[in-house]
Amino acid sequence: MEERNKTLGEFIIENQKAFQYSSGELSRIINSIRLAAKVVNYKVNKAGLVDIIGAAGEQNIQGEDQQKLDVYANEVFIQTLINREIVCGIASEENDDFITVQGSDNCHNNKYVILMDPLDGSSNIDVNVSVGTIFSVFRRITPIGTPVTSEDFLQPGINQVAAGYVIYGTSTMLVYTTGFGVNGFTLNPAIGTFYLSHPNMKFPENGNIYSVNEGNYVHFPQGVKNYIKYCQREEEDRPYTSRYIGSLVADFHRNMIKGGIYIYPTSSKASKGKLRLLYECNPMAFIAEQAGGKATDGFGRIMEIQPTELHQRVPFFCGSKSMVEKAEEFMAAE
């Protein structure tokens, strides 16, 4: 079978066979993400026709106004994972605390926990901008057969066993890694099947796109200001192109394909940064590194940060390796 004609299901089965002692649990998690993503995709594509755009009237733990689609996507992913009894715990941007999944026999025997942002960029849904789902999977630390604890979720990113995102745009794609490269699958809406469309995805070593909210320029650290000036300076290979959508998944996806850097630094308005380490930065960092890119907080590797809280925020510099390293040079000289 031609590589690009493979369905996601076939790809998962083939890769599971490559591991002698694989139990299939991780494969079932990816399959559950696939199923939930199709349900959410259907609702996202109908958002302008039904009463599901706009604010839900409540705030999440971050103090952000929840969108109706945030709430819907959160429920879909959580219920899909719980009903299939394939994880022992779930943490979501939309929930204050993690959820313990007992299983029908109350045995707590599953090996993995999942952390997710069920609908990244949802504040843009009203204006028809691409949104996405981000997920990260860890093997639990506490003994199998016992309820999960915060220790199972507060792991550094280097312990991730899988991570990925779904982008709901002009086409719907699921991109993920299990530590052996990055592959992208595009949904054929006519038959509801994901097909391998982007095998072995790689960040270009360099790029000419920088993605940062320049409206916050006056609030940025001097190192970030200096890097932005560097990107704008007219040289042989510059100025770079500024592209910022405001949806992490969409900005990251474009930069991985075309080459670029995404920056969300600390600022005088957000002293710790805005993006969440566990279910935004860690999974994107894992994907970036598997695709030959780099992800740091401006000074050190994102995936080596030891989390201290579930909704911890960090600054984020992610993209083509040489561009991230150049940004780090400016941060170090600050």
UniProtKB/Swiss-Prot annotation:
Protein's UniProt keywords contain Hydrolase: yes
Residues that coordinate or bind Mg(2+) 2: D117, D120, E280
Metabolic or biological pathway, per its Swiss-Prot or TrEMBL entry: Carbohydrate biosynthesis; gluconeogenesis
Names of required cofactors: Mg(2+)
SUPFAM superfamilies, sorted: Carbohydrate phosphatase
Cofactor, how bound (note): Binds 2 magnesium ions per subunit.
Family of the protein in this entry: Belongs to the FBPase class 1 family.
Name this protein carries in UniProt: Fructose-1,6-bisphosphatase class 1
Organism of origin: Flavobacterium johnsoniae (strain ATCC 17061 / DSM 2064 / JCM 8514 / BCRC 14874 / CCUG 350202 / NBRC 14942 / NCIMB 11054 / UW101)
